[in-house]
Amino acid sequence: MLYVVGIGSGNERHFTKEAEEILNKVDLIVCYKNYKKFVERLNKPIYTTGMTREIDRVDYALKEAKDKDVALVSSGDATIYGLASLAYEINAVKGYNVDIKVVPGITACSLASAILGSPLNHDFVVISFSDLLTPLETILKRFRCALEGDFVICIYNPLSKRRKEPFLKAMEILAEFAKDKDYIIGIVKNAGRNKEEVVITNFKDLYKNLEKYLEFIDMNTILIIGNSSTKIINGKMITPRGYLDKYKI
């Protein structure tokens, strides 16, 4: 059996009870090398690979799962930019016929939203700015459509030291929409981990101080761009559900 397990931020308190139980019972844990530190406490054999070796990692986990219980670990939730879909694909393409069970985890957008206040309390869109697997033009088209629809937008993988173009082009698009209104932006770096940092600002500040933010934002950062209703209440970023517009209190 292959268990595809989401471990949230990796912090022990963000492991679900089910994830903890599964990881304690399996024979082998397979994960990205930087996540090894999150599961070493379980005292299980661990197999790791580096960045861009996802196919090798998943294939190895499936082969091992033919005759033992294996946990394939993803940060956050394995079905949200995680390895769950790849496990199902490889299992089918290679005809392994391994039983697969996905164990949900706390995804970064949910965790970041709670840290910021409640910015995802109405309709929202999640977009990854990584163009390793998705063409840049597709990313930017989706981003523009989300702005046109007045969705709150949660951005994964906003930029890295070598990959700034998607973020910069997206900010140019956002600047077009910000001519007549400003956007509240929440930034959470290392959500739920050591050295967690939180910034609530607005687009005008971000765009004016872009170089500073380019140094601050990285692949471990979540950006949440508010919609036209998003506001700051007592220092927290809030997107109202609409109750007070409809009901008197």
Curated annotation (Swiss-Prot):
One of its GO terms (biological process) is cobalamin biosynthetic process. Pathway: Cofactor biosynthesis; adenosylcobalamin biosynthesis; cob(II)yrinate a,c-diamide from sirohydrochlorin (anaerobic route): step 3/10. Gene3D superfamilies: Cobalt-precorrin-4 Transmethylase, Domain 1, Methyltransferase, Cobalt-precorrin-4 Transmethylase, Domain 2. It catalyses: Co(II)-factor III + S-adenosyl-L-methionine + H(+) = Co(II)-factor IV + S-adenosyl-L-homocysteine. Its EC number is 2.1.1.-. Pfam families: TP_methylase. The keyword Nuclease does not apply. Keywords: Cobalamin biosynthesis, Methyltransferase, S-adenosyl-L-methionine, Transferase. Transmembrane segments: none annotated. The keyword S-adenosyl-L-methionine applies. InterPro entries: 4pyrrol_Mease (IPR000878), 4pyrrol_Methylase_sf (IPR035996), 4pyrrole_Mease_sub1 (IPR014777), 4pyrrole_Mease_sub2 (IPR014776), Cbl_synth_CobJ/CibH_dom (IPR006363), Precorrin_MeTrfase (IPR051810). One of its GO terms (molecular function) is methyltransferase activity. Belongs to the precorrin methyltransferase family. May also convert cobalt-precorrin-3 to cobalt-precorrin-4. This is Probable cobalt-factor III C(17)-methyltransferase.
